[in-house]
Structures are given as structure tokens and as C-alpha cells.
């Protein structure tokens, strides 16, 4: 297995953060990101960038973090107990975009690198990441295009890659207490290292670079779609699912909180406004009901 180079990974991640922020500012056309650099007492730090009150994006956050610690936290060793007690280094770019218009989907993306050290032993390392889409209104064209973009970036790495990571995404972003997916999925991968450092890093780069290519056309297509208070209230209600998932199930959120990460940056994924409604039921025959019946479950979007 080729030797991992964390300096190379960090340089890519910092550049990716810049490129995504520039792309989102161009899409929004009105607001700019504010940057907040921070340091962590135990080692490392990061830079959080948040855009608020834009013409298109109500809130968008794009975080870079690079943290170190003397021992792996429980969230990272739950499925790899042999790593308990190792020192670690973790770096990544994580972003969540909450658009203003309910016809534009919310989206999340993340690419990350972990390396764990122990004296007298080879380092243990892996890449993880992915991206997923959470529409509020059912536009089949958007979902198919999103998954086609995901499949296209996977193809150079093997025919089996897209179906594998698409399924993993469906399984990961599942809310058991709601019996529904968080959205329409995309890609999710973790523990990637068997192909060696260069190939694993290349795939992580493809996912990071492919995110905006997949999302920008959907934003452009829906940004001028008219909406009223009814659609806005439904969007705020559905945002509640985002909060439920991130605070109850998301491994990244738990990892950040357990490692003494920066709370403001970790909770940047939360929507700026959200509402809950007791025993909500969508009106039969409406687009909201179609979202529930046709979109909030795993589907093969490229073979309908």
C-alpha cells in the first residue's frame, strides 16, 4: 500500500474550499462568505466560511478543519475497535447549503481523510465522503441528473463503484424513527484505502470536484420558480428532518462533538429557520404527498 501524504491531501482540501465558495458566490450573485479561522487547544484548527441572507442561498456553510488528538474518539472506533488508543489526525471539507427558494433542494457534501498512528506500527488511514440531495418538491429531472453526475464521476474507478456508494448513501441517510430517507441520496463512502493511497485520493478528489458540477445546474433551473407561503412552510417543516438526522444519527456531528471540535462549525449544518408540526399529513394528490410517496425511499433513479 503506497505511503499516505497528508500534506498533499490538505493542500487539495484548502483549494477545494476556495473553489466551492467562489462557485457558490457566483451562483448567488449577491452575498459573500465571511471567514472565521479557529484553533483547537488539543491540536489543529480550521476555517469556517458562512454565507447568509443571499439572493439564492438563505445560508451556506463551507468548513475546512484539520484536527489532531492523542486518542481516537468513540465515534471513530465504533466499527474499528482495533484503533482505540491510537493518536489521530483528521482533515476534511464539509458543506451544507440551505437555499431560500423551496424549489431548490438543500444539499450536503463532505470529503475527509483520517490517519491513526501507533508507535512501532504502520499508520492506519482511510478516506471518506460523498454528497447527497434533499429536495422539498418533486422534480424528477433534477434527481436523475444528480445521480447521472454521481455515476459519471465514479465510472473511471469501476462499474461497481456507483451502485455500491449509492446504496451506502441510501442506507446512511435513513431516519428509522420516520421510516424515510433524508432525501434522494447520492454517494457515500468511508474506510477507503484498499486501492492504495494514490487511487483512493483520486476518488476523493473526483467526489469533491464533482459536487458543484452536479448541483449548480439544478440551482440555475429552479432559482426563479415562483413560490408562496404554503411552499415556504412545507420547506421549513421538512428542514426539521435535517436537524433530526444530524443531531441523532450523523457520525460526523458526533465525532466533532466528542473530540472537542468547534461547536459553531459543527452545528453550521443546521438550517437557519425550521419548524415542527404535530402529526403533519400532506394533502392527498399534491406535490408534497408525491415527495413522501415517490422520493423519500431508496430508488434506482437511473433505471425508472
From Swiss-Prot:
Localization, UniProt: Cytoplasm
InterPro entries registered for this protein in UniProt: Coprogen_oxidase_aer, Coprogen_oxidase_aer_sf, Coprogen_oxidase_CS
The family this protein is said to belong to: Belongs to the aerobic coproporphyrinogen-III oxidase family.
Residue ranges, annotated region (Important for dimerization): 242-277
Any one Pfam family match given in the protein's UniProt record, by short name: Coprogen_oxidas
Keyword Transferase set for record: no
Gene (name only): hemF
Record-level Gene Ontology MF annotations: coproporphyrinogen oxidase activity; metal ion binding; protein homodimerization activity
List of residues binding substrate: 94, 110-112, 260-262
Cofactor: a divalent metal cation
Keywords: Cytoplasm, Heme biosynthesis, Metal-binding, Oxidoreductase, Porphyrin biosynthesis
Any single GO CC term annotated in Swiss-Prot or TrEMBL for this entry: cytoplasm
Subunit structure: Homodimer.
Pathway note: Porphyrin-containing compound metabolism; protoporphyrin-IX biosynthesis; protoporphyrinogen-IX from coproporphyrinogen-III (O2 route): step 1/1
Record's keyword annotation contains Acetylation: no
Active site: 108 (proton donor)
Catalytic activity annotation: coproporphyrinogen III + O2 + 2 H(+) = protoporphyrinogen IX + 2 CO2 + 2 H2O
Name assigned to this protein: Oxygen-dependent coproporphyrinogen-III oxidase
Function: Involved in the heme biosynthesis. Catalyzes the aerobic oxidative decarboxylation of propionate groups of rings A and B of coproporphyrinogen-III to yield the vinyl groups in protoporphyrinogen-IX.
Uppermost EC category: oxidoreductase
Chain positions of site Important for dimerization: 177
EC number(s) given by UniProt: 1.3.3.3
Biological processes per GO annotation: protoporphyrinogen IX biosynthetic process
List of residues binding a divalent metal cation: 98, 108, 147, 177
Amino acid at each position: 500500500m503506497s505511503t499516505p501524504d497528508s500534506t498533499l491531501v490538505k493542500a487539495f482540501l484548502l483549494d477545494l474550499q476556495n473553489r466551492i465558495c467562489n462557485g457558490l458566490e457566483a451562483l448567488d450573485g449577491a452575498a459573500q462568505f465571511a471567514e472565521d479561522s479557529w484553533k483547537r487547544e488539543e491540536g489543529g484548527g480550521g476555517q469556517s466560511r458562512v454565507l447568509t441572507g443571499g439572493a439564492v442561498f438563505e445560508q451556506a456553510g463551507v468548513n475546512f478543519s484539520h484536527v489532531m488528538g492523542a486518542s481516537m474518539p468513540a465515534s471513530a472506533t465504533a466499527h474499528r475497535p482495533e484503533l482505540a488508543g491510537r493518536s489521530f489526525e483528521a482533515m476534511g471539507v464539509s458543506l451544507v447549503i440551505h437555499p431560500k427558494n423551496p424549489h431548490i433542494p438543500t444539499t450536503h457534501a463532505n470529503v475527509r481523510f483520517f490517519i491513526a498512528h501507533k508507535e512501532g506500527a504502520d499508520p492506519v488511514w482511510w478516506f471518506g465522503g460523498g454528497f447527497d440531495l434533499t429536495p422539498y418538491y418533486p422534480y424528477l429531472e433534477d434527481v436523475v441528473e444528480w445521480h447521472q453526475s454521481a455515476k459519471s464521476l465514479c465510472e473511471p474507478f469501476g462499474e461497481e463503484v456507483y451502485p455500491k456508494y449509492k446504496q451506502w448513501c441510501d442506507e446512511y441517510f435513513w431516519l428509522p424513527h420516520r421510516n424515510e430517507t433524508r432525501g434522494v441520496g447520492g454517494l457515500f463512502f468511508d474506510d477507503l484505502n484498499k486501492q492504495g493511497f494514490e487511487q483512493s485520493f483520486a476518488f476523493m478528489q473526483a467526489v469533491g470536484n464533482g459536487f458543484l458540477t452536479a448541483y449548480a445546474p439544478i440551482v440555475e433551473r429552479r432559482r426563479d420558480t415562483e413560490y408562496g407561503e404554503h411552499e415556504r412552510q412545507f420547506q421549513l417543516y421538512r428542514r426539521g428532518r435535517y436537524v433530526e438526522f444530524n443531531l441523532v444519527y450523523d457520525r460526523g456531528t458526533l465525532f466533532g462533538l466528542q473530540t472537542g471540535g468547534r461547536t459553531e462549525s459543527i452545528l453550521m449544518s443546521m438550517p437557519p429557520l425550521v419548524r415542527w408540526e404535530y402529526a403533519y399529513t400532506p394533502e392527498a394528490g399534491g406535490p408534497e404527498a408525491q415527495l413522501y410517496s415517490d422520493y423519500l425511499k431508496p430508488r434506482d433513479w437511473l433505471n425508472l
